[in-house]
Regions:
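Phosphate-binding P-loop
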Residues: 10-17, 90-92
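Proteolytic processing junctions in secreted/extracellular precursors
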Residues: 2-10
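Conserved substrate/cofactor phosphate-moiety recognition/catalytic segment
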Residues: 32-96, 108
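Conserved glycine(s) of the Walker
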Residues: 29
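The conserved Walker
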Residues: 25-26
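Conserved phosphate-donor/acceptor-positioning beta-strand/loop module used by diverse small-molecule
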Residues: 118-139
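Conserved GTP-binding G-domain of TRAFAC-class P-loop NTPases and closely related GTPase folds
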Residues: 133-223
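Short hydrophobic/aromatic beta-strand immediately N-terminal to the Walker A/P-loop
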Residues: 19-21
């Protein structure tokens, strides 16, 4: 059962019923893009990577992702996913605005999640962070947690193969591509992306399911 504070946060969240799916392979710079394009909006970030890396450090496992540690690493990944899924469920229960971080390699998984959110009244969008393979591999080597190069290449190819599918699923007006090959030295790129995100967030909630939920929660609050 939600507390009074949780109820208020959901009902009066300025970005209620808004969800942004983030796609981009290892080395695409997704975390930086999220910070620059959604920072200050109050959207809740759903990302198991930070928790996973915390658990890796606690277990004293190598961030170079050595194959000899795959079993122990999978245990920590499962722990991180469990915590993240619980947080996500709590956010969704309050219908809070979300940024759901992922690689985008599995179109079926993301489209299924997005469809589920749409069924309860969410507006769903995607921010697709695009880079060349060369840039992605170079950036991957500079990451704290390095993905093996062969795996990074395969993931990049999988993500790239889904661009058209994602654009068709979310629709051109709800699909933002960020070309992140070159450094955004003057800030124009991220300023442009931020404005696009803000424009999507500013759309009024018009879904009947969302409105019904809001009316129900308001009545509960007034009791």
């Amino acid at each position: 059962m939600k507390s009074f504070t949780d109820l208020q946060e959901g009902l009066y969240d300025p970005n209620i019923f808004k969800a942004f799916f983030l796609a981009g392979g290892p080395g695409s710079g997704k975390s930086y893009v999220v910070k620059k394009s959604t920072g200050g909006t109050g959207l809740k970030i759903v990302n198991s990577d930070d928790i996973f890396e915390k658990y890796l450090a606690q277990a004293k496992l190598d961030f170079k992702m050595q194959s000899s540690q795959s079993g122990e690493r999978d245990v920590q990944r499962a722990r991180a996913k469990k915590v993240t899924d619980k947080r996500k469920a709590n956010y969704i229960e309050g219908r809070l605005g979300l940024v759901i971080d992922g690689t985008g390699k599995d179109f079926g998984k993301i489209s299924s999640q997005a469809a589920g959110l749409k069924q309860i009244g969410y507006d769903v969008h995607m921010i697709f962070v695009n880079t060349s393979l060369e840039v992605a591999l170079a950036n991957n080597k500079q990451r704290k947690r390095v993905v093996p190069e062969k795996l990074a290449m395969n993931m990049w190819k999988q993500v790239q193969s889904n661009i058209g599918k994602f654009q068709q699923f979310f629709g051109p007006k709800n699909f933002i591509i960020v070309d992140n090959d070159m450094p955004d030295l003057d800030g124009r790129l991220f300023d442009h992306v931020f404005k696009k995100v803000k424009a999507l967030l500013s759309r009024k909630v018009d879904n009947w399911m969302a409105k019904a939920w809001m009316n129900k929660e308001l009545k509960l609050k007034q009791r």
